Structure formats: C-alpha cells, structure tokens
C-alpha cells in the first residue's frame, strides 16, 4: 500500500494466510498506512486464523500521526523471534529520544481523535485530486484506496513516465516520481503525493494541464 494506493482485499489476505499456515511461513506485514484507508476497515494479517504466531508487523508514527522526522517505529511479533529482532535493532540503530517515546504513547491514545480527522481531510483531497488529474490529457487515475498517493497511468500521453516527470518538473514546477522506481510494472505510471492543501493540489493540476501539450510535441519529435 505504501508504494501505490491499493489495499489488499479480505480474500487476498485470507489466501496469503492460508498459504503461510500450510507451508509454515512467516509473513512480514508493513502496516504503516493501516489507519489511512478509505471506505473500508483494515484487517491486520495477524487477525487471520493461525497467523498470530507467524506474523511480524512493522509500523510507526510518521504517517498516521504526522510524526515524520522523529524516526520512531515498532514491531509486533511472536515472542520466539523477538531476540533476533532485538539483535538486529541494537546493531542497526541506537536510542530513541525519551520525549519521542512519550509523544508516541500519547499518539496511540489519540484522545482527541486527531487521526480520524486527518483521514477525513485526506479523503476529501484524494477525491478532488483524482477527479482533477483525470481532466489532464493522457492521465488516468482511479481514486486511491489508502495512504496519500495518487498512482496515475500516463500511457496515453505517448511518452515515457520519466519524460512526463521531467516536463512537469521543469516546465510546471510540479514533482512526481516515475512508477518504474517501484518496479517494472510501474513503467506506465507516475506517483503524486496529495499530502498538500487542496489549494496547492488544484494549482498543481492546473499547471500540469497547461504544459500537457508538451506530451504530444515530445512524442512527435521522437
């Protein structure tokens, strides 16, 4: 979910769990965006039958609690693997500041409901952003299911994703990441973040739309 914007269905996760149990495998589940999903409830891999003793959850505070830069994460794992995780941890990084740990405790309590309010705001932005991106010639964007990224198909522009990103950056001042950075299946995609304000997102799309004739000029030049 963190690379793109999709959320595994219950059916897919159940099948993964069945395979893990059948073949006695561990599942490493990155759930950093678990609280930022839209129109559905997230089910952790650990909740499926037989998975509590074979799931290692990776999570943190930078996404759901806007604690980016404080660099605090955690694992939830079976007791049998904790010694190995501790050995890895103490040889990879050292002490997290005490005040950050206290802040994390308060974040998990979330007494004021800040995270749900943040997700509601992201929901408004993702709907607006996807709708406006679809008005750009050559762009196709399904509404994101989770996180705060838009995964946009740019195949209809007729040029490579890297070239689309270059034009947007140099001529419109808008940054995106070529999808191939996340694997070969992303070669016809670019990824945007919609963690900015609605006004900034709207301005970004307007700028992209103004430079979109460059898609055709670049394709013809080739």
Specify the residue positions occupied by each region the protein language model found:
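PLP-dependent class I/II
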Residues: 4-222
């Amino acid at each position: 979910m963190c690379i793109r914007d999709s959320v595994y269905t219950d059916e897919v996760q159940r099948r993964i769990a069945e395979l893990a149990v059948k073949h006695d495998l561990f599942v490493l589940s990155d759930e950093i965006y678990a609280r930022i999903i839209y129109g559905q409830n997230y089910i952790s891999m650990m909740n499926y039958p037989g998975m509590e003793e074979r799931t290692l959850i990776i999570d943190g505070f930078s996404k759901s609690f806007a604690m980016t830069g404080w660099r605090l994460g955690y694992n939830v794992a079976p007791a049998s693997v904790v010694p190995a995780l501790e050995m890895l941890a103490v040889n990879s990084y050292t002490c997290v500041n005490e005040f950050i740990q206290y802040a994390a405790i308060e974040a998990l309590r979330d007494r004021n409901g800040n995270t749900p309010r943040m997700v509601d705001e992201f929901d408004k932005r993702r709907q607006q952003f996807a709708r406006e991106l679809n008005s750009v010639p050559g762009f196709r964007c399904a509404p994101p299911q989770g996180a705060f990224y838009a995964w946009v198909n740019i195949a209809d522009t007729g040029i490579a994703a890297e070239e689309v990103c270059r034009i947007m950056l140099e001529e419109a001042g808008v940054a995106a990441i070529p999808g191939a950075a996340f694997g070969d299946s992303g070669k016809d995609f670019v990824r945007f973040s919609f963690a900015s304000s609605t006004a900034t997102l709207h301005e970004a799309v307007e700028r992209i739309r103004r430079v979109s004739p460059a898609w055709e000029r670049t394709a013809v030049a080739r």
